[in-house]
């Protein structure tokens, strides 16, 4: 009982002492504590917004309780503790666990240098040849006769061209020889059809004579044409008849022909294709192809041909071997040459003075930085004596020697003989290895000192069993694969070197890190092993090995960190790490400990040290840190504001340098265009040049042709010879009628013709009016119109036998006029009808008419007669009316014609 009382007294005293110390501490550091408390809550609240859920829960609990409230089951108040952070590692106790798994650190780590792929690299000079895709070009001569038949129909003023037919025929061989020796052609052509000989003459002359060749006006750069006639001839036939004429033109065309390897045929610019090798000479049929009719093929050695077909008496040239091929429309001739002398399968492409050859398992890689390309080839060399290399062998060796003399003669020596390789793309590489003179001297010195050396490098020979012949594969047109290979090889070498450095640095870093971990584990094995395994682990040394166990987890929300690190019982002593209180899971008993690294709780609070003033200590807890100044909590610090120790090992990796790829053009556009035997451009130019020769005289051609004439001609032609003759007759008659109608219509359409028709119409109207008025006067005054001489100039009637002037007498009465009209003599008229004269008989009437006719003839003769003395007309002598000229001349003076003396006597 006494012991219990004693214990209670001791506890009460301890509480009084603690409360007194707390009051004195709060009174001496009231301002600082208050500021620290406010800063702590502010920082904790700010950090809780970006922290984990557990932190927010702890902060809320701290805020919900009062500052002076006592923590459950402790003598501490909530103002004496701060919140916690469990972001990375949870709070745990690792010192209580017993190790069950044993581990140790490796000590004998050996880092070996990573070696790249074993490659045999050689330096040298490279000359590259490509396949020659340009077709073999040579000259050919084409002999032709052009027969042009034209049919026309002639109208009166127009000629209709009914049609034209052009036929190309081949001259006979005897005429070909005459053309080649004299530049002349005959003006006729004969053909046998079904046993009948048909002959055509130029201009229908029916005379066979020679015509001189002359240059055509239409030629181009690749073809030259010689003709005998430049203008097409046609003659107009008779009117309303058909006419068909013949125009014969001899034509010799010297044009270009192309043949592509393997030279089985060739094609000309005129569009002709000959299935014969241009190198076939009659004896090399196994090497040269022949696919034409052998009966029409001729070869003449030492054949003479004029040098210029367009010049008379031109000099003759002798050709070694000339071939002739007869066809239905032409004769083609060319000179036979030796294939080896005029063709070559290879042509120079590029040269690289700095080339690296790397040896792979089954191939060689020829890399050129200048060409930004890598070419692959088999290890088997091409036989230097291959016949395909004859045309380029000397040229390639000379180029290699020239490059060596220019760039390497002073510092390098040739290493080995010239070797030839064929790449996968069909290219041919001439390779000359080189090596520095200093290295060559060292090799020679080593060979002299080591007599037992059996693995000396020997020169490669092309005469060995590994030599092959050049294949007939075609060269590729695109070298993208070579540039891709160069890129891959460059990247491969760079990446391999980088990986080797990375692997070596990685091994060294692992070895160093392991040694550091081993030494640090002696201080805090749990922290080191937790960092290695990235999870909380309890570890302790068990001799020279480590024992591993899992840590004991605690209630995360019960952990509280004390603000004060001073030891109350021992003035001048301070805790080396902050004191924490916590509860184990499923327990309400409050435990004391100290905050370790990575939120590890160290059991007990015996870790103290002498207080050092001033003092600054920072303890990491998750993503934040507790800052204690003079062993009192001041604030929470974000870890990102504290710099870290840079312990990274530098890795020596250089960035890739820029590489500008060259645009490699294996074959130019000209070579690609020349590789085809058919050049469309030249063919069209040749066609247009010949088309311009076919021209017509437009003033002699009327288009369109009347459809009825064309239909009638077709109809009658289908009836045979008789129908054709009838058609010609009908066409002549119908053509005449049509010509007249067409002429009238054309005349009416002409402005001059229309004006003439208008004038004719006006003249017809005037004539009609004059005839009408004359007939009307004739009806009203028949005597005055029929016998104009009975009327005097003053309008009175003239009567013969009367001497008395009646102009002054009064006119007779009506009765007298009627009576006197029937009287024959003077005397008073009779008023009785019985006294009238007897009727005239027919004979008397007839005699009267005859007398009237004689009188009329005499009077008209007198009017039309002329006086031989003075030249005046008879009408003027007899006192007729003045003529029109006299009246116009004297119209203002009142001119009147006076009577002659004869007239006065008669009166």
UniProtKB/Swiss-Prot annotation:
Membrane association type: Single-pass type I membrane protein
Signal peptide location: 1-24
Record site: Cleavage: 460-461
Glycosylation, residue list: 68, 73, 85, 208, 281, 286, 302, 341, 383, 405, 409, 417, 447, 452, 456, 466, 555, 586
The entry's keywords: Disulfide bond, Glycoprotein, Host cell membrane, Host endosome, Host Golgi apparatus, Host membrane, Host-virus interaction, Membrane, Signal, Transmembrane, Transmembrane helix, Viral attachment to host cell, Viral envelope protein, Virion, Virus entry into host cell
GO cellular component: host cell endosome membrane; host cell Golgi membrane; host cell plasma membrane; plasma membrane; viral envelope; virion membrane
UniProt record similarity statement: Belongs to the herpesviridae glycoprotein B family.
Protein name: Envelope glycoprotein B
Lineage of origin: Viruses, Duplodnaviria, Heunggongvirae, Peploviricota, Herviviricetes
Gene name per UniProt: gB
